Amino acid sequence: MTMEAKAILRTARISPQKARLVADQVRGLSAERAVNLLKFSDKKAAHLIKKVVESAIANAENNQGADVDELKVKTIMVDEGPSLKRFMARAKGRGTRILKRTSHITVIVGAAK
């Protein structure tokens, strides 16, 4: 059985479309390189994804005794979470609904073979 560790961040306050831009850059990289890339990105999603990747690395290290240098980001998924519905006043007494989207971010790290 291959060694894998998983970490999930649920209901992150960022739209899935914006989070996927960052997730696509990290997918398939070594864990150390992924964290380094995310550390120097100025996007909001990079900070959130970095925390999830670091959590997955810690899970692999603590729960399965994995060597951090051999880990790579096998899977990273950004799914749509529940939307927060907000109301914005418009002209002539009308209103428009605003959807503040959230994301579920899942990261799976495993041994690079």
Curated annotation (Swiss-Prot):
GO biological process: translation
Keywords: Ribonucleoprotein, Ribosomal protein, RNA-binding, rRNA-binding
GO molecular function, one term: rRNA binding
One GO CC annotation: cytosolic large ribosomal subunit
Disulfide bonds: none
Quaternary structure and partners: Part of the 50S ribosomal subunit.
Family membership noted in the UniProt record: Belongs to the universal ribosomal protein uL22 family.
Function in brief: This protein binds specifically to 23S rRNA; its binding is stimulated by other ribosomal proteins, e.g. L4, L17, and L20. It is important during the early stages of 50S assembly. It makes multiple contacts with different domains of the 23S rRNA in the assembled 50S subunit and ribosome. The globular domain of the protein is located near the polypeptide exit tunnel on the outside of the subunit, while an extended beta-hairpin is found that lines the wall of the exit tunnel in the center of the 70S ribosome.
Name of the featured protein: Large ribosomal subunit protein uL22
Gene: rplV
